[in-house]
C-alpha cells in the first residue's frame, strides 16, 4: 500500500523555477544537472557530484582512507528536517532485498499538480563482522555511493546518459522508519521483515539515505512485460544498444568494473518526449582507440542503470560483499570479466521469474532472439541440475567461468544487429 508519509511547504520561488525547468522534460544532461542544483538549494546536504570537476580521477579513492565521512563528507543529519528543507511530500513505493524506496513529490503553488520528483533509498546497516563499522567505505552500502559518484562523471562529461545521477547522502536514525510500520503508513512484507530484523538486533541504529534522480517509467522488467506485444525490432535494438553502450563506456575506462547484479529490474526507465523531426540521438563512442558514431532512434524511453551495492572496480571501489567467501561460489569476485554483466542481463532476462515468454513469443522479432542467442549461447544459458556435469551456469543464471566470451565493445563493433545504427562507412561524423 502506497501512502504519503510527509507534507512540507516549499518556497514559491523554488516552485516557479522547478516549473520552468520541468518544461524542458529532463531529456538532456544539462537539465538533469540543473535540477540537482535547484533541489539542493542552500540546505546543508552536500552534492555527491562536484559539477565543476569533470574527471573521474577527482573522485577515485586511491588513498588508504576507509572512512566514508572523510572521503565523501557523509554527515549524520535529521531526516525530517532535511526533507522539510528540500520540500514536498514523500510516498512509500516499495521494498527490495537491501533497501526501501520512497518517492519525493513536489507540487505546484496550488498543491494540486505534481511537477517534480526525486528518489530516496533507505538502507539499513546489517551487523556483520566482515562489513565493519557503518562508516567503512568498503561496506556495500557505502561502496554503492562510491560507485555512483565515480560513474556519474561519465554522465557529467556527456559520454553516456544511462546512469542514475546521485544527489546527496547522509546517515540518520532508523527510528522514524520503524515508526512508519507501527503507524500503518507502510504495509509491506519486506518492510515488516526489516522491522523484525531490527528488533532482533541485526541492524545498526543508523540507516544510510541516498537521494537521487527519479525514473518515471519504473524498471525495465516491468516495461518489457507491459509492452512486449507492441515492441518493434527498432525498440529492442535501441534498448539493447543503450544497455551495451553504457557498459562499453564504463569498461573502456575501467575494464575491471563489474555491476554483478545487472538484471532487468535493476535498470530503470525514464520516459522522454518524441520529437517530430530529427528523432535520433548521435552517440559518439570511442571503440578500439577510435571514435565511432551511432544514430540511435528515440523510442520514447531512456534506460538508466542502478543498484550498485554489489558492484566493484578493483583498486578504486572496493566492496566487502564482493570479497566475501560466499560470493566465490557464484563467481562474484574482484576480477576483470567484461562478459559477466552482459551475460547476467541477457541470461536472466529470459528465465523464470523474469520474462520466460521471450523465446516462444511470436510478437518478438526473430532477429532479437538471434541476437540474444549470439550473446548467450546455449552452453552458457543451461541451468544446472544435480546430474549436470558441465556446470557453466548457476541455477539463478550466473556464469561460473571467467572467460570473456564476448564483451560490449566487440559487440558494438562487429555484431550485425547494430548495422542500421551505423550512419556511414566512415568511423565518425564530422
Question: Which stretches of residues belong to each language-model region?
Answer:
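Catalytic activation segment of kinase domains across protein kinase-like and atypical kinase folds
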Residues: 256-336
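ATP-binding glycine-rich phosphate-binding loop
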Residues: 56-114
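ATP-binding glycine-rich loop module of kinase domains
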Residues: 104-164
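Conserved kinase catalytic-core helix
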Residues: 151, 227-259, 264, 274
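Compositionally biased low-complexity segments enriched in polar/charged residues
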Residues: 1-13, 54, 58, 62, ...
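Conserved structural core of kinase catalytic domains
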Residues: 161-233
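Helical subdomain adjoining the active site within ATP-dependent kinase catalytic cores
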Residues: 11-49, 320, 329-430
